From Swiss-Prot:
Homodimer. This is Sensor protein PhoQ. GO terms for molecular function: ATP binding; metal ion binding; phosphoprotein phosphatase activity; phosphorelay sensor kinase activity. It is found in: Cell inner membrane. The modification Phosphohistidine is found at residue 277.
Amino acid sequence: MKKLLHLFFPLSLRVRFLLATAAVVLVLSLAYGMVALIGYSVSFDKTTFRLLRGESNLFYTLAKWENNKLHVELPENIDKQSPTMTLIYDENGQLLWAQRDVPWLMKMIQPDWLKSNGFHEIEADVNDTSLLLSGDHSIQQQLQEVREDDDDAEMTHSVAVNVYPATSRMPKLTIVVVDTIPVELKSSYMVWSWFIYVLSANLLLVIPLLWVAAWWSLRPIEALAKEVRELEEHNRELLNPATTRELTSLVRNLNRLLKSERERYDKYRTTLTDLTHSLKTPLAVLQSTLRSLRSEKMSVSDAEPVMLEQISRISQQIGYYLHRASMRGGTLLSRELHPVAPLLDNLTSALNKVYQRKGVNISLDISPEISFVGEQNDFVEVMGNVLDNACKYCLEFVEISARQTDEHLYIVVEDDGPGIPLSKREVIFDRGQRVDTLRPGQGVGLAVAREITEQYEGKIVAGESMLGGARMEVIFGRQHSAPKDE
């Protein structure tokens, strides 16, 4: 049973639309039809009453009161409006005259009806109605068909009661006119049957049209579902914004979400790449220290602080990049104050261990008063990448100098290597771009350095060094000190 229910529930939008609209159409059709039929029925009753009242007036005109007796003379040429039977009563309810002797019909007339004008109905079985219409062969044939279908069927006859006050020539009379043709056999009664047929035909025609309308109306949703499937299959990057007005906001928000998720994914991937690159230096120092321990060039007591320092740096770098990955655009930068000289001393010390075999000579010309305003890890990451690049490509010498203004910090790194061709001085800051493809590397370090300096409204300018190699000028902006709390 549950499986069967799952096949139908939850219902699709098309089925919901079809069922809801069909229900509305059915209810409205029934409501309008019932109003029309009730109105027609009321109008039919009024018309019938007027016809029977006219018949009653005719008999009142033909009636004569002579010798305390009622006489009604019917001319042979009178054309009655419909087959009827007339009964005339006095004010006490006593039958004075009957057009025909039909005992069962006389018993059906209620005494209360004779007190006032009114329109009533009486129920009779098919056989009694047949006796009442014994002279009408066409009606008899119809009654026979009804009898064959249902021998216990009842026929409804309309009854009009009209009370006439006493006059100088006539006492008070009550004339009852009975329509001998039952309502069920009148052509007007067929309206009820027609209504059923019309309603059925209406539904049979409307449901296919509603299905077409639902298909056409829900095409934008089907198109959206198709685009979502294409997104899942990686055949599409964004949803088509050219859709219906009702779906525009949804599509726009979904596209924003997709773009945000894609940017977050790219950011995580970039951060992971940057983290991998940043761990190269401390891992290289650890590797160099382990070699020194193995060759007994360094004692355990000397190697321990070096290794602990690099492990601490690895931990800091992991925390730093995790923090960067979780930061959103526009996050305020740290406003901490850090002396530049000690930070560069630690970096050069680590790089000397990495490039120990190469014998790189790194010289510093940094005033103790020069400070960096910002996050320490940002500074270490930028200068670590720039200095690593200088040590990698230099022949022997690397020189570092710095100066500071109210708003900017300038750090210049020069080497005596082959330098950077003029045509490559902008390309090297793009991810994956390298001047020398023969040396190991991924082309990530300078790109990371530039991205961080841009967060400080700064930049890195590549040029030619007086030593004959490359000259990298790192410029940090936003270096005004934060106001101190008093």
